[in-house]
Amino acid sequence: MWTVTVGLTCLLAMLPEQSGKISIENPRLLYGVPGLPRGSNKFMHGDTFNLAFDIKGVKSDAEGKVSYSLLTEVMVDGRLEFKHESKDIEAIDSLGGNVLPGFTQLNIGLDQPDGKYTVKVTATEKKTKATASVVQEFILSKAELGIVRIRTTGDREEKVPTAIFSTGEDLWLNLSIVGFARDKAKQPNLKITMEIIDSNGKPTVQKPPVAEISKDVAPELDLLPLQFYVSLNRAGKFTVKLKVVDQISGKNSSVDIPLEVSSAK
């Protein structure tokens, strides 16, 4: 089963001319929208597919209004499996120019067959009827233990997604665990670690935070959400290393995420 979210992330001034043609450029996979760059096109069951892109050449009216729609299609082996067309999306081109950073977001079901998928996104600019498309392939791995739905927010309630970080700010790293085993009491036994490595390859703390989950998990829960707090106390480039160990099955899974923090101005 698929669910989809599409929309506009922000407005920027880039191209001064409006030619009547549009294009979709700079497609990128992210951990959330906005989110940190995702370096792999391999996904797991229960994960979220986030594709961001720039729609260039859109035409605004005298008040700076831009109207467009997005069609998202998911195909496997050349066969259309899922299709979603958004309602008209209206944006205000407050800064001028003719580029709209947009996105499509797909929630991958736990029962989705593994294999190779193709996502095609088509943007239609309503005023000129111009269209442009982008295609992104991804691989859905076999169902197993993993860390999914990674996203960064500036608040604990997960209402403020962010991918730009400055010193003095708070960062909440949100994620879910999938594919874990349960004991005779129907409870998991998981150990999740978040280790941060600096640009010199050294851990930032001697004892990284660890979450241990072994009780009070509802029997029907297949996706186990949790979050880690990160205090952005200095600038630099870091790697966040997440690891989950299932102490019942003996399996483990890990993910490395790049993190860059700038000095506050």
Q: Predicted segments — roles?
A:
Residues Q18-K265:
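Intrinsically disordered, low-complexity terminal regions enriched in Ser/Thr/Pro/Gly
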